């Protein structure tokens, strides 16, 4: 990770205040983390190269920011079950700066909701992220305002944020992760 120790949650900090090797290295390990810890990990992660995300990545929804209590727990439990329909994302870089992608749903049978990829400033802070923009005419109207972004936690593991872009502001609605 390329950040100061202050950006790393205390649960992943060594006793001397330096980053430890306990930064999660799997989708399952990320599922156990709360929203504040995910936010700190995201801020401290790296900007991925488009070439590194090429191909099919397994996905996992981690946590929602718009629900609390039992509702949030129920959503997390469903997201970690085999019944959850989202399987991941597939990335097809065009060059080092831009690319395309699509979501894989229901046992990878359906490829839905195309997005364009590019590196730009994150909505979460003063750093860059790989942006996933769903605003294209092939997507249904309710998908077009979604703006995802991802950062690399470790080789082969990416942490993402999903935003809903409304006329006046973008609102963070959930965290997700992708893995090779």
Each language-model region and where it sits:
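Soluble ligand-binding/transfer domains with enclosed cavities or grooves
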Residues: 2-180
